[in-house]
Amino acid sequence: MTQEELQIGSEYFAFESGLYETMRTMNYKLVFLEPHLERLFSTAQKINLKIHHSLEEITEMLEKVINNFPDPNQRIRILSVPNKFIIYTSHLNLNPLIYNGVNALTVEAKRDTPEVKTTNYHVCLSALNKAIEANSFDAILCDKEGNIYEGSKSNIFWVKEGRLTTREKDVLPGTTRRTIIEKSQISVHYGIL
């Protein structure tokens, strides 16, 4: 299987009943493994997708893939569609601009099932393509009134009245998002921007 075949937007991401998880490594160690695998199995249950591997087997497969890749900092993806379970990795190429702020544009769009991370990724992919065409880093999904949901590939937080604020519902309950909420040094509020 080629790298192109495994990218979001390929035929493997055309399955309505598939799911994926994206993780990263730092120095060959998986970051937030447990919550990612919890979400993997939770999503599979919600969309009626049978995963034919145990948590332990998947962890072993992940470690094997990671340890056979030359770069210690990787982006790992698990792709599960009916009768296929694929784990692959690539170099973690973080855009250095993210540390100083990036451009984004708003797109009227909402994930069909924001509570799960499925291969039904058409809404986010279309929004991201619009952002790329406009030389923006990401697209911010919003409703008809301009209220923000989330980024096509990112979480959205803002500080308002000294509180860290984010939407409570209608967004992917991501691992990074949850960690930010749990570790925040300022109070967290749920609201609409």
Question: How would you name each of these model-derived features?
Answer:
Residues 67-74:
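Short secondary-structure junctions
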Residues 77:
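Dinucleotide-binding Rossmann-like beta1-alpha1 core, especially the glycine-rich loop
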Residues 1-67, 81-193:
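Helix-start/capping segments and mature chain N-termini
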